[in-house]
Amino acid sequence: MALGPDRRFGMRVDTMTPAQTQAAEIDAGLRQYMLRVYNYMALGVAFTGIIAMVVAMNPAVMQAIVGGPMVWVLFIGIIGMGFVAPRIMMSKSVLAAQSCFWVYSAMWGALIAPYFYIYTQESIARVFFITAAAFAGMSLYGYTTKKDLSAMGRFLMMATFGILIALVVNLVFLQSSGLHLLMSIVVPLIFAGLTAYETQQIKSWYYEGDMEDATHKKSIFGAFLLYGSFVTMFVWLMQLFGVARE
């Protein structure tokens, strides 16, 4: 039966075909799924900010991070979570997936806590909104584009490994300000592209038609990916545009 008005008994009744009904249900389900992804991500960003402020108010912890090995523990922990968390999130329970996400967010918060001492509050707020605008634009593009971004995503994922190696080499051996400046420009561009790719991938996962538990874990994993891209962009843009305290 085609979509159209039914005027029997003086009443107008719109009907839809089964295919149209299914499409409407998919659209509603997709919106709910993506909203859950973005809600988790936003909560993760807020949690990171809270942890960063709490750590910044504790001089002993700050000293351990800035003047001790704790910064390397956090750095290695964050990198390790990037490899381990996806397996846990997709193979364990929803609670395990949530726990990984919150631990990851907390470690990032502790790592960037020194920013409250290094940079002015105005520049932190400004760079945060710049990052949010760039993230929103690229995520919207990834969600709406009909172009397959898989090839771009694979290339950018390979580029992140190169960036990671260059970062470690520069921190430990070279300590080159020029290379650091170059990375501050390149890294946000890479993760902006990854934001679009990840959004497209996260959207495609919904159409796999999993049970609610699996879909919930996918939304947490999707938030984990987008959160990582957002925070990485913010960190490097801070080093590029942040204004140091006098």
Describe the function of each predicted region.
Residues A2-E246:
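A hydrophobic alpha-helical transmembrane-helix feature that marks the membrane cores
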